[in-house]
Amino acid sequence: MATKRTFQPSVLKRKRTHGFRARMATKNGRKVINARRAKGRARLSK
């Protein structure tokens, strides 16, 4: 029995969990965005 691949890509799932709107929805998510802004990241979220 082969083990299944853990990465099953879905754009919708990715956006809902790691997207910009999802980050902004929570206090800790906003902390993530601000930390990435302070670091000078080109991409703040997926």
Curated annotation (Swiss-Prot):
Record Pfam families: Ribosomal_L34
Transmembrane domains' residue ranges: none
Q: Which terms are listed as keywords in the entry?
A: Ribonucleoprotein, Ribosomal protein
GO terms of molecular function: structural constituent of ribosome
Superkingdom as given in the UniProt entry: Bacteria
Keyword Ribosomal protein applies = yes
Biological process GO annotation list? Answer: translation
Tell me the protein's name: Large ribosomal subunit protein bL34
Task: Give the originating organism.
Answer: Vibrio vulnificus (strain YJ016)
